[in-house]
Amino acid sequence: DEPTTDLPICEQAFGDAGLCFGYMKLYSYNQETKNCEEFIYGGCQGNDNRFSTLAECEQKCIN
């Protein structure tokens, strides 16, 4: 699937790992908990709700 670009990044699904089998610890905004949380990204596809650092996620998604 293509990234979900029609929704704002912080409203896209939390922790979309994608279809590949890499192992990258990234951060994603979780709308249910209203926090940025760590998840494992597979390295391809998924959506745009993924950030390299907790600070980057919080800066973008937590007001």
UniProtKB/Swiss-Prot annotation:
UniProtKB keywords: Disulfide bond, Protease inhibitor, Serine protease inhibitor
Gene Ontology CC annotation, any one: extracellular space
Site feature Reactive bond, where: 21-22
UniProt name for this protein: Chymotrypsin inhibitor SCI-III
GO molecular function list: serine-type endopeptidase inhibitor activity
SMART domains associated with the record: KU
Disulfide-bonded cysteines: 10-61, 20-44, 36-57
SUPFAM superfamilies per record: BPTI-like
Biological function: Inhibits chymotrypsin and thus avoids the accidental chymotrypsin-mediated activation of prophenoloxidase. This enzyme is required by the insect immune system to produce melanin which is used to engulf foreign objects.
Domain BPTI/Kunitz inhibitor span(s) in chain numbering: 10-61
Origin superkingdom: Eukaryota
